[in-house]
Amino acid sequence: MALRTLDSLGSLAGKRVVVRCDLNVPLKDGKITDDGRVRASIPTLHALIAQGAKVAIVSHLGRPEGAPDAQYSLAPVAQRLSELLGKPVTFASDTVGAGAAEAVSGLEDGDVALLENLRFNPGETSKDEGEREAFAAELAAFGDAFVSDGFGVVHRKQASVYELAKALPSAAGALIATELDVLDRLTENPERPYTVLLGGSKVSDKLGVIGHLLPRVDSLLIGGGMLFTFLAALGHRVGSSLLEADQIGTVKGYLEQAKQLGVEIVLPRDVVVASRFGVDAEHLVRPVDRIEDTGWGTSGLGLDIGPETAEVFSERIRAARTVFWNGPMGVFELAPFAAGTKAVAQALTEVDGLGVVGGGDSAAAVHALGFSDDQFGHISTGGGASLEFLEGKRLPGLEVLGW
């Protein structure tokens, strides 16, 4: 079956439509610091408003413990949605209680309401199917149809993603359709050379995608904290850098597999080593075989790829026709260790082909470092969902929509 899209729902004029968006944005002092996910939800919302639907948006934010927690309120998001849509957005003080019921019942054709954080309710993320179904039924009472547009959560079997889609006539929104189109281009006959750049802190988070991609790519570039496990697998000493010793054997297996497949795994030549973790820490650039040659010995820790590596990676990225990047090259939140991430991001903007930022921390990094969405071929809104798709996994939030 093909993914059901908005057209499959017929006319939605005057209909109540519950829309699952992913509005899980970072907040600081009650202010949104990166509104990328809010902006990504706008095309679907505009389409529903134009049809004259009565739109009730649901989303999570953060990881509250199944109960109301003011620091995770969606109230700031309602304000930003209103600004982007150019119309008032009613904010409900709860998700399925009297506040939500009043907000939805008061909607006129083309109006929009945002209900409070889904995860203030234990049924949203419950491991018990019956509890999820009961919560989904409460949400379904607010709609005549359901539109799933939160790509960042389609790999989760949660009430508003899976059970709600079964409880109402349902379809995917424009964002999910766009995300899948891009991911299909990465998996179905990608233009070559095809280069994948992986970073982030842990090898263990990327094992599945490394194993699945090795037979499919031309080269794999490794940065971020995970690089030190690769270096250790080659016999290098890495000081106090992040190291998953229990994954060294697995990494050795991947290095051997890549050799047999003729796929090049490109590892850093140099790294930025710091005396400690901190923005004002002393730091030096060292070749990967001299990480402990700093005066700090085994207490030094690598926090970014070095300038030579950044140039090598950038050249590889610019030479490719298809590039997928997931995971920062270093601790980009600290200015002395952001150069590697900034360099590869810049190179990705210069790709003559498809350059994809794979969501999560990578998307946060490009925004924090001053890049705009339109500089890249695509910035995914789902880090975990993108990786699981590229691992070849079936995603419950998509299967329930006919995918």
Curated annotation (Swiss-Prot):
Residues that coordinate or bind ATP: K206, G302, E333, G359, G360, D361, S362
Residues in the signal sequence: none
GO biological process, one term: glycolytic process
UniProt xrefs under InterPro entries: Phosphoglycerate_kinase, Phosphoglycerate_kinase_CS, Phosphoglycerate_kinase_N, Phosphoglycerate_kinase_sf
Similarity-based family: Belongs to the phosphoglycerate kinase family.
GO cellular component, one term: cytosol
Record-level Gene Ontology MF annotations: ADP binding; ATP binding; phosphoglycerate kinase activity
Protein name: Phosphoglycerate kinase
Keyword Ligase: no
Binding site for substrate: D22, L23, N24, R37, H60, L61, G62, R63, R119, R156
PANTHER family: PHOSPHOGLYCERATE KINASE, PHOSPHOGLYCERATE KINASE 1, CHLOROPLASTIC-RELATED
SUPFAM superfamilies tied to this protein: Phosphoglycerate kinase
Subunit relationships: Monomer.
Entry keyword set: ATP-binding, Cytoplasm, Glycolysis, Kinase, Nucleotide-binding, Transferase
Pathway listed: Carbohydrate degradation; glycolysis; pyruvate from D-glyceraldehyde 3-phosphate: step 2/5
HAMAP family: Phosphoglyc_kinase
Locations listed in the record: Cytoplasm
Catalyzed reactions: (2R)-3-phosphoglycerate + ATP = (2R)-3-phospho-glyceroyl phosphate + ADP
The enzyme's E.C. designation: 2.7.2.3
